[in-house]
A protein has these predicted regions:
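Charge-rich, well-structured scaffold segments of protease-associated domains
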Residues: 28, 85-234
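Preference for bulky hydrophobic residues occupying beta-strand positions
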Residues: 27, 35-37, 48-52, 110, ...
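Envelope-exposed proteins and targeting segments
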Residues: 23-25, 31-33, 44-50, 104-106, ...
Length: 234
């Protein structure tokens, strides 16, 4: 075997061994929410994230772009977080946040100093439990998504390339369209359709909550029960 191949195998094996050393705790809450906890006290920071098992593959062919649209819409606020305040709460507590969508899932996260762990858990419980979905939020985020498409697709060289490839690769499969979807479909959708999509997919039993960083496992579990056991699965 060439020396290069031997070296590659050794390095690859070492990488696998290191990956296996990551310890975590996982369990399910009674409402179906899957929880993953990883303790790493090397720095005073925590990451709180929720992954929903919903992406563009879960959309109807005449209503594409819904999952990506909800990536934006669920930052609009909740019954306990005023419109436009979500990101202000994050930044004012020393954190940052973002979200992204693929064909298979939608992912939200916050990173905070570890003394703001409860803030992160509360924010995600509000997003899941009490989202406010109304006409003004839908209209606002519709314009945001249109601008994103203009910037990243319409006004980029070969911006439509991936979409054209997917159409040809997956002619009879929901991978046929890219997550950003059709602006015409979003324009035609009614408020009731958006509300129904939210109730169907953005629920505890369709989500994974992961928390990693400078945490105390028992205290974190208590916070999980405080903010998530009251959630409904319907």
């Amino acid at each position: 075997m060439p020396k290069f191949s031997i070296l590659f195998c050794l390095l690859f094996g070492a990488g696998i061994a290191n990956a296996q050393k990551v310890a975590f705790t996982e369990y399910d809450l009674k409402n179906g929410l899957h929880v993953i906890l990883h303790k790493d006290n090397s720095a005073p920071v925590v990451a709180v994230s929720v992954m929903y098992h919903v992406g563009s593959k879960n959309e109807q062919p005449e209503r594409t772009g819904f999952a990506h649209f909800f990536e934006h819409l669920l930052f609009e606020g909740s019954e306990n977080i005023k419109r436009g305040e979500f990101m202000k709460i994050v930044s004012s507590n020393g954190g940052r946040n973002n979200a992204n969508t693929t064909q298979d899932r939608t992912y939200y996260f916050e990173e905070f100093p570890s003394n703001q762990l409860e803030t992160g858990i509360w924010l995600e419980s509000e997003r899941m439990m009490h989202p406010v979905i109304n006409e003004i939020g839908v209209k606002t985020q519709n314009e945001v998504v249109k601008e994103e498409k203009r910037m990243r697709v319409d006004n980029q060289p070969y911006g439509n390339f991936l979409g054209e490839v997917m159409k040809r690769l997956f002619t009879k499969h929901p991978y046929n369209w890219v997550p950003i979807g059709s602006m015409e479909h979003l324009d035609a959708a009614t408020l009731s359709e958006f509300i129904a999509f939210n109730k169907k997919f953005y629920t505890p039993n369709n989500a994974v909550l992961s928390i990693a960083g400078d945490i105390d496992l028992e205290k974190t579990k208590k916070l999980m029960y405080k903010y998530t056991l009251v959630l409904n699965t319907s």
